[in-house]
């Protein structure tokens, strides 16, 4: 995707507005989305190590959130199947949101409009069922 120096892209498909924004991840062109149609808004964010402050306004008080809650930090650190380097990558700003980080961000973002929160990108090995 050609960002032309921008951190957000705005697309329209008929009545659907799609805002695409960069996430902080070690994959090329990792992005999140805000879908809007009339007064309904839906946020989709996975594959990010943190949420940049400049996106808070864009992400605040939406109807639906699908939000990364990848791992429990202690379970990740105690997992013998993950090398230390992998653990450090997952925990980094270019990795994945922990359950604690996800709940922190959601507590700042949700509002009166919010009806649904769906936790996504949950690690099968480093998260409680």
Residue ranges and their predicted role:
Residues 3-64:
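Core dinuclear metal-dependent hydrolase active-site scaffold
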Residues 53-129:
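Cap/insert and terminal regions of metallo-dependent hydrolase folds
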